[in-house]
Amino acid sequence: MRGDGPPIRVGHRGAALLAPENTLRSFEAALAAGAEAIEFDVLDLQDGSLVLAHSDDLLEVSHGAAAGTVRDRTLPELRAIVPDLPTLDDALAFLAARPEVLVHVDLKLSTRLDEVADALARHGVEERTVVSSFHLESLAAVARLAPRARIGFTYPEDRHGVARHRVLHPAIRVGTRGLRATLPMRVVGMAARAGAQALMLHHAVVSAAAVERAHAAGIAVWAWTVDLPDELERMHRAGVDAVITNDPRILDSAPAEALATLRP
């Protein structure tokens, strides 16, 4: 959860800028680009299947192939549209065969959490997994059901799909500046309420003061979704423990002076 040098490279939905997101092909692209951890989203379908999908928007999940909703379809119906759609078991089998890779499961469901926990245990990846959500009840359930997994609290809740945009809208930038100013006073209580060992923070709300307070309380800080050099440089200066990015190669261009300032 905490890095001993440069921040942990976390591939966002695999490597969403290099291959279709939340697919095994995207996982492979992320690892080829130097990712040390893979983040992916888990969503539940009406037939009980757990699949890798960021939202209920079929246009997003099908990579633009079809419109509609996701959750009210069965796995065979979805795979007729998105042949490479992985299930949770598919993803964990891939990662179980790569024991050096950290696993980051981002919950897009609040039910069937026992099945998520069971899958982590069956594939032997629980101890190297962090499970994240903004939903406190879901995190509490996972902590009980998968006690060897780490818990990450996501902040702020991404109601407007901010993570999809490489450049923030001016109104959103103003809002995040306000959150960034107050966050240092809130990080410890926020993590405590969530029972979290890590805070998954949007890069726009991260500050050195927030990271310092989190670290003083033994809490890791992972920043999402960092795709631009200036964002990366600011995360280096703030001292975050992990960078979640759509293209892990961005860390190859990190300035040496920024790397040298990272705290252990």
Task: Tell me what each language-model feature is.
Residues A15, V42-D44, L109, L228:
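Short, glycine/acidic-enriched loop or turn micro-motifs at the edges of active sites
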Residues M1-L17:
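Long, acidic (Asp/Glu-rich), low-complexity accessory segments flanking structured domains
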Residues F27, L88-L92, L113-D118, L136-A140, ...:
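Generic structural signal for well-ordered alpha-helices
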Residues L85, T154, V162-P264:
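C-terminal active-site rim and adjoining tail of enzyme catalytic domains
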Residues G3-P7, Q46-S49, H54-R159, I172-G175, ...:
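Metal-dependent phosphodiesterase/phospholipase catalytic core, i.e.
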Residues V10, E39, H104, I244-T245:
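Generic enzyme active-site microenvironment
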Residues E21-E28:
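Short amphipathic alpha-helical segment that frequently serves as the phosphate-/nucleotide-binding helix
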